[in-house]
A protein has these predicted regions:
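Right-handed parallel beta-helix
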Residues: 105-106, 138-146, 218-228, 241-253, ...
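Short glycine/acidic-rich loop motifs that flank beta-strands on beta-rich extracellular proteins
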Residues: 78, 92, 112-113, 151-155, ...
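Extracellular beta-rich repeat passengers
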Residues: 322, 342-473
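Short, small-residue-enriched loops and turns at beta-alpha junctions
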Residues: 55-57, 290-295, 324-325, 351
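Extracellular "leader-to-stem" segments immediately downstream of a signal peptide or signal-anchor
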Residues: 2-82, 87-100, 104-216, 221-223, ...
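Active-site-proximal loop/turn and secondary-structure-junction residues that shape catalytic pockets
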Residues: 87, 239, 249, 288-290, ...
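Conserved short loop/turn motifs at secondary-structure junctions
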Residues: 83-91, 261-263, 292, 348-349, ...
Length: 473
C-alpha cells in the first residue's frame, strides 16, 4: 500500500516537475552564472467562485465571494480558486499563502470604479490598496487564459496633447474636470456616481493603485493571463524572491499615465519569458530602490527572454531607481516594434546606483520613435500637472546616490528606424557611464547615428554599423 501511495504521489507531482524542468532550458549558454527559478507548487484543492456566491453578470459585486473562496482554501492549506466564464465585478483581492488564482478562458475580472473600496481604513498613506495584492506570502500565482481589467480610466489623468479630439470628447463625457487651461483632464466627479476619496483631483491622482502588487513574497507565478488597463503599474512584484512571468499579455492605452507593464522592483531570481507588452510607459523594467531593513534589496539574477514589446516608453528599461544595485541581468531574443526607445538606461541624482554583469543580445527592433539605445543620467520624475521646465535641486544626501552604469555588454542588435541610434550622456565630474561595450550591432534608417557625450561617458563600439536616410548633423 505504501509503495502504491508513493507511485500515485509521484505521478501527481510529475507535471509540475516536468514544467519546472522546462524552465531549465532557458538557462542554457548564459554569459554569466545566475540562480534559476523554480515553479511554485500548490495543493490539489479547488474552489469555484460560483460555489461561494460569485455571480459573473458584470453588475454584482464579488468582493466577498473572492474573500470567501480564498479563506476556504486557506483553511485547507491552499489550492486553486477558479474564476469561470463571466464578467466578475469586484473590489480589491488579497491572496494568501499557497493560493493560485486561476481564470478560465472566458473569464474577466473587472475592478469596480468605486474608489472607496480600495481605501485602507485608518491608514495615513497617500496610496490605496492594489487591485490584487499579496504581502509576505509564499507560493502565490495568477494563471489561466482570462483577462484582468483594472478599469484605469476611472483613475488616470489624461494629457490633452496625447489624445485626439474624439478621444478628448469621450473623456469629458465621462465627467471629470479640466485643469491647466484645458491641457489636463482628471477623473473627478465622474458620471459613474461614485464619490471621490480626496478633496481635490490632484490629491486623488496621487492615490492611484497598481493592478497587481506583490510585496515581500517568495515563489510567485504569473502565467497566461492578460493584464490590462491598470490605474498605474500593471504587474509589479516588489522585494520578492523566485518570480516567474510566463506567457502573459500586458496592454493599456499608449497614452496611459505611468502605465508600466512589468516592473521588477528589488527582486531576486526572476524569469520573464514568452510575454507580450503594449503599454503606456515602461515595458520590461528593472528597478532597485534604496536599501531597507529586513527586506530584499537590489535586483539580481533576472533572465528576460523571448518577449515582444510593442508600444512603451522603453522596451527594456533599467531604472530610474537603481540605488541598491542591479546585478546579473540577461536580456536576449526579444522583439521591439514601435517603442519610444529600445534599450533604455535611465537614472538620476538621488536614485542612482551601480550595475554589474548586464548582458543584452539578439535583440531586433523596428520603428523606434527616439533612441535605439540610450543612457540617461539626469532623469527626473515629472508627475502629471508638474512644471516640465522646473530645474531640480538636490541635497548632499541625495548626491550620494548617483547613477553608475557600468559592466554592460550589448551585442547582436538589429534596428530598422530610429531618430538616433545610440545616445549617452553622463554628469560632468561624475563617472556615471563607463566600461560599456556595444558589438556586432546594425542600426539603419536613422536621422542621427550617435549622440555620445565623450566628456561624461566611456563607451566602446566594435563592429557597429549605422545608415542614415538624411545627412548627419
Amino acid at each position: 500500500m505504501n509503495k502504491l501511495l508513493n507511485v500515485v504521489a509521484a505521478a501527481m507531482m510529475l507535471p509540475l516537475s516536468a514544467q519546472a524542468q522546462d524552465y531549465a532550458k532557458y538557462y542554457q549558454n548564459l554569459p554569466v552564472t545566475m540562480q534559476q527559478v523554480t515553479r511554485p507548487q500548490f495543493p490539489a484543492n479547488e474552489v469555484n467562485l460560483k460555489d461561494v456566491g460569485g455571480v459573473g453578470d458584470g453588475v454584482t459585486l464579488n468582493t466577498e465571494a473572492f474573500k470567501k473562496g480564498i479563506s476556504k482554501l486557506e483553511k485547507q492549506g491552499g489550492g486553486r480558486l477558479t474564476v469561470p466564464q463571466g464578467v466578475w465585478l469586484t473590489g480589491p483581492i488579497s491572496l494568501k499563502d499557497n493560493i493560485e488564482l486561476h481564470l478560465d478562458k472566458n473569464a474577466i475580472i473587472y475592478f469596480s470604479p468605486d474608489k472607496r473600496l480600495y481605501v485602507i481604513e485608518g491608514s495615513k498613506s497617500s496610496r490605496v490598496e492594489p487591485c490584487i495584492k499579496a504581502s509576505k506570502r509564499k507560493n502565490v500565482a495568477i494563471t489561466g487564459c482570462g483577462i484582468i481589467d483594472g478599469n484605469g480610466q476611472q483613475w488616470r489623468p489624461v494629457k490633452r496633447n496625447k489624445v485626439s479630439d474624439v478621444e478628448w470628447k469621450a473623456f469629458k463625457e465621462m465627467g471629470g474636470v479640466e485643469k491647466q487651461n484645458g491641457s489636463l483632464w482628471y477623473p473627478w466627479q465622474m458620471k459613474s456616481g461614485f464619490p471621490d476619496i480626496k478633496d481635490s483631483p490632484e490629491k486623488q491622482e496621487k492615490m492611484r493603485n497598481d493592478l497587481v502588487r506583490f510585496t515581500d513574497c517568495e515563489n510567485v507565478l504569473f502565467e497566461g493571463v492578460t493584464f490590462q488597463n491598470a490605474p498605474k503599474f500593471h504587474v509589479h512584484p516588489c522585494n520578492c524572491v523566485n518570480v516567474i512571468v510566463d506567457g502573459i499579455t500586458v496592454r493599456c492605452p499608449w497614452n496611459a499615465q505611468n502605465g508600466d507593464a512589468i516592473d521588477f522592483s528589488d527582486c531576486h531570481r526572476g524569469l520573464i519569458v514568452n510575454s507580450t507588452v503594449d503599454a503606456g510607459d515602461d515595458g520590461l523594467c528593472m528597478k532597485s530602490g534604496k536599501p531597507k531593513e529586513n527586506s530584499i534589496s537590489g535586483v539580481e539574477d533576472i533572465l528576460i527572454q523571448d518577449n515582444t514589446v510593442y508600444h512603451a516608453h522603453g522596451a527594456f528599461v533599467l531604472g530610474s531607481e537603481t540605488a541598491s544595485g542591479v546585478r546579473r541581468i540577461v536580456v536576449r531574443n526579444c522583439r521591439f516594434s514601435g517603442t519610444d526607445t529600445g534599450l533604455r538606461f535611465k537614472s538620476g541624482i538621488g536614485r542612482g546606483g551601480k550595475t554589474e554583469q548586464l548582458y543584452i543580445s539578439d535583440i531586433v527592433m523596428a520603428d523606434i520613435k527616439d533612441e535605439a539605445i540610450v543612457f540617461q543620467c539626469d532623469y527626473v520624475d515629472r508627475p502629471a500637472g508638474s512644471d516640465p521646465n522646473a530645474i531640480p535641486t538636490f541635497t548632499d544626501e541625495q548626491r550620494r546616490w548617483a547613477p553608475n552604469f557600468q559592466d554592460i555588454h550589448i551585442s547582436n542588435v538589429v534596428c530598422r528606424g530610429a531618430r538616433t541610434g545610440i545616445k549617452a550622456a553622463g554628469i560632468l565630474g561624475l563617472d556615471c557611464v563607463h566600461d560599456i561595450d556595444i558589438q556586432n550591432t546594425t542600426i539603419v534608417y536613422t536621422k542621427k547615428d550617435k549622440d555620445i557625450d565623450d566628456k561624461t561617458t566611456k563607451l566602446t563600439l566594435k563592429d557597429v554599423t549605422f545608415s542614415s536616410l538624411l545627412p548627419l548633423k
